[in-house]
Amino acid sequence: MSKGRVLVAMSGGVDSSAAAALLVEQGYEVIGATMQVWDYSTCDIEEGNGTCCSSIDVDDARAVADRLGIPFYVINCEAKFRAAVIDPFLKAYLEGQTPLPCVNCNTYLKFDHLVKKMRELECDYIATGHYAKIVYDDKGKASIHTSTDDWKDQTYFLFTIDPELVPKLLFPVGDMKKPQVREYSESRGLVTARKKDSQGICFVGNQGYQNFIKDHVKSEILASKKGLIKRFPEGQVMASHEGIHNYTYGQSKGLGMDYHEKLFVIKIDASDNTVWVGEEKHLFANEVDVVDPKLLDEIQDGEIMNVKIRYQHKGAPAQVIKTASGFKLKFTEPQRAVTPGQAAVFYRDRQLVGGGWITL
């Protein structure tokens, strides 16, 4: 007897392939679906080499579905992806921020577009290859927790999920480590078993985000983002630059200037296109403002939580204080290179509680 019908989001990578295979083994009625999100022929990227949902990835996902004997759908999401992921990505850099496109992709495509497909196909669950876990408490309430593989854990990108969707989520590889996922996939004869992981931003690839921006933003707009590099905090003009989109907080290489000491980007002021550089000590901050929060569970005003300010950040204890626009975070220890456009994500032990967007 089937445990229920589940739609698996298959990116064409090993993790989602393994997720589909595990669910078949566990007795679910599995349906695979891949989102075609981007025309990689418009970019200087080799398809299938660290990409996600390209035509080659779609073919790989279909091959896995055929191997498993499950139905498979391709959903064209290019227009939605452009509007919800690419355009905000470009806009953020032009405003002096460092965007986090994976969260937008999860919010507006994986857990929106695919959820609609899940309901259309009358599925009971939706599954992905994310490294995360669903845990039920003694009252039967479901919550998202970090995965067994701390290094690969992807809960940082999941804080915008609708809480009502959580009981319908399955993360089959959440109890496994990456080498186990590859070994399992190989044992099942899946073509993706030794496929490279996607690295960095999937639609940018190895060309670098500056080149991607240059290819997708009009030259006159880029020219309007030129400005000065000034010393922080004194204000001494040190050089000119070719655009604030070429810089991010904490950057120390490729500043476009020579100086006798190592300097870092401390602040980017989009109002006058000034890039402020200074000593590393100026990168540290005790307090951070977070806007547009999304919560999966309640937070007590002033509660101490473990907060991650970027992916692969180990997290640090901070007091979470409610404000009119979101939260103010007061860290126990100063944090380095707190970056506007990135997310601050809250954890209670291993439970994902919510998060919001960093602003300075």
From Swiss-Prot:
Keyword terms of this UniProt record: ATP-binding, Cytoplasm, Disulfide bond, Nucleotide-binding, RNA-binding, Transferase, tRNA processing, tRNA-binding
Gene Ontology BP annotations: tRNA wobble position uridine thiolation
Pfam family, one: tRNA_Me_trans_M
Annotated localization: Cytoplasm
NCBIfam families named among the record's database cross-references: PRK00143.1, trmU
PANTHER family on file: MITOCHONDRIAL TRNA-SPECIFIC 2-THIOURIDYLASE 1, TRNA 5-METHYLAMINOMETHYL-2-THIOURIDYLATE -METHYLTRANSFERASE
Protein name: tRNA-specific 2-thiouridylase MnmA
Gene assigned in the entry: mnmA
